[in-house]
Amino acid sequence: MSKSLVSQIAGTALLALMPFAALPASAPPKPYVVLDKSLSQLRADFNANVGKVRMLYIVGPTCGICLRGMSDLQETVYSKRGDDPRMVTFVVHVPTLGAREANVAAASRLISNRYTTHYWEETGITGKLMQQVIGDDKYVWDFWTIYGPNVIWSDEHLMPAPSFWQHQLDGLPPEKKLEPYVFAAKVDEFLAQVSAASATSTAATTGGKSE
C-alpha cells in the first residue's frame, strides 16, 4: 500500500479529532465492532476460530507508525495470501494519542481481508491486559501477535499469551521490533499446522467471519 494512502488515512484520522455533527439516522453500518470493557465479544470471536491461525493487533487509529504497520502487513501477509480461511485477524483500536471511535473507520481500510474484524475499545483495557501477559511495566499498544491454532482464551480476566509477537514501541526488546517479512514468515509456519479442509469447513459454518 502506498505511503500516500497511509498519509491520507492519517490525515482523515486527525480531522476526525475535531468536533463533528451527529451521524444521520440512515448512516451505513459501522465497519467495526464496539467492545465493552469485558472484551466478551472479542473473546467469543477468538474462541470461535480455534483451529485457525489468529492474529491480534493492538493499534492506535491516529498513530502514524501503527498505520504504517498495518499497511506493511497488508503487503507482506494479506495481499499475498488472499482470503485464506485458515487465518483470522482481530484488529483492536485503542484510544491512544487522543484517538476516538470516529477514527476507526478510516484506519480499518488499511487491512483488506474477508477474515479480518476491526474493533473499537474505548477504555484501553486491551493494552493493559496484554501488558500483564508479557510482564512489562508500560502500556502495550502498537503490538502485533500471532496465536497458534490450539490456543484457547479460557480466562475471562486475562488474555492468552501470544505464540509470537512483535512491537513498535520504545522500551520493549529491540530484537522483537516489527519486521513485516519476518512476521509473514512466522504466519506461514503456523499455517502449515492447519488443514485447509478443516478451516474451510469451519468458515462455512461461521459465515466466513469471526463474529
Label the predicted regions.
Residues 61-65, 94-99, 122-126, 151-153:
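Solvent-exposed loop/turn segments at secondary-structure junctions
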Residues 49-64:
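Short active-site neighborhood of thiol/selenol oxidoreductases, capturing the structured segment around
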Residues 67-109:
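Structural microenvironment flanking redox-active thiols in thiol-disulfide oxidoreductases
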Residues 108-138:
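Short, internal strand/loop/helix patches
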Residues 142-211:
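Thiol-/selenol-based redox modules, centered on thioredoxin-like
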Residues 51-54, 84-89, 112-117, 141:
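Loop/turn elements at helix/coil->beta-strand transitions in domains of secreted/extracellular proteins
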Residues 10-21:
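Bacterial N-terminal signal peptides
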Residues 22-45, 68:
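N-terminal "domain-start" segment that seeds a small globular fold
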